[in-house]
Amino acid sequence: MLFSGTIEQNLRWGNEDATPKQIEQACQVADAFNFISELPAGLKTELGQGGVNLSGGQKQRLCIARALLKNPKILILDDSMSAVDTATDSRIRSALRNCLPQTTKIVIAQRIASVQEADFIVVLDEGKITGIGTHSQLLQDNKVYKEIYDSQIRKN
């Protein structure tokens, strides 16, 4: 969720004392730095309530950057990259892995690509756990996971 005010003000909800360098680093990890830099006013760009002047993917990336400014021990991403393309999703996941190695990340996603490198994956079907394991284990042992994987691979 974004609020009226500037991009910087929205990010500072995560840490009002964040330095410009910390804000830049969080934006880099969230793959938001480039699109912010391309805006005429950059971080000083005014957002309408809910960030109406940004795309869904841009809003999600700003929310991720704001969460990163809290320097969390646990980061929960609940379908937080659903509005970004797969290449952006991949860049963000890679940056999170490399820049926050000590942070526990809980990723809730519908895209297999978003979770396949996780230490372990919990598969839910109609609210019930049907499997827990690594990507390769679940492909081999879990019918629901395999069906989701096959349907997404065929789409691509």
What are these regions (language model features)?
Residues 8-49, 102:
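ABC ATPase nucleotide-binding domain helical subdomain, centered on the C-loop/LSGGQ "ABC signature"
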